Amino acid sequence: MTVDEAETGAGPDSEPAAAGAGWRPGAGDADARVLVVDNYDSFAYNLVQYVGEVAGAVTVRRNDAVDLAGIRALDPDGVVVSPGPGTPAEAGVSTAVFALDRPVFGVCLGHQALCASRGSRVGHAPEVVHGKPSTITHDSEGVFAGLPDRLRVGRYHSLSVEREALPDELVETARTDEEREVVMGVRHREKPHLGVQFHPESILTPRGKRMVRNFVEVCEEHE
């Protein structure tokens, strides 16, 4: 979750995602078709742009403009759940999408939705962060494959997942390298479901596009 809608402006290139758009060809060499669930966040467009640069095709739906049956009808190879204001309970289809067996990548609010879908608690973060660069450590798997052990990322959130309440089916994959550690990433032990609390599409996350590419590769491998 971002602190509020205004805080998520990603710079001059940001614009609202086109919620009703059909499949648009991507510029990448991958065949995967990726749906982006837009949680009414200005960062969603940046995610769509990143996905479009590496995937075979991309489309966008607002979180209240499609249900699980509609997503299945679209038949994407993977789904990205965007950041946004509010809580997972207020984010439409964003939590239900994790009932799918196909790859799903949750970003910020999407990450919290993944955790909430498995019974995790989402509460107030140790501090409210708005465009804060942080260093994280990670497990070098999933979206972190092939990346340095320590990464700089951009954080925009007032809520976070409570580590003590993570169920056994979720593995913590990243955390802040600070005195008050915050869960920065999780993955499901069996399903190809991944989440990150930070914003890979932010200018404050230099390796963010590689993370999106890694997710598209997960989609390719799952086909």
What are these regions (language model features)?
Residues M1-T95, P206, R210-E223:
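N-terminal beta1-alpha1 cap of cysteine-dependent amidohydrolase-like domains
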Residues T59-A65, G86-P88, S134-T137, V153-Y156, ...:
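Short gly/ser/thr-rich secondary-structure transition/capping motifs
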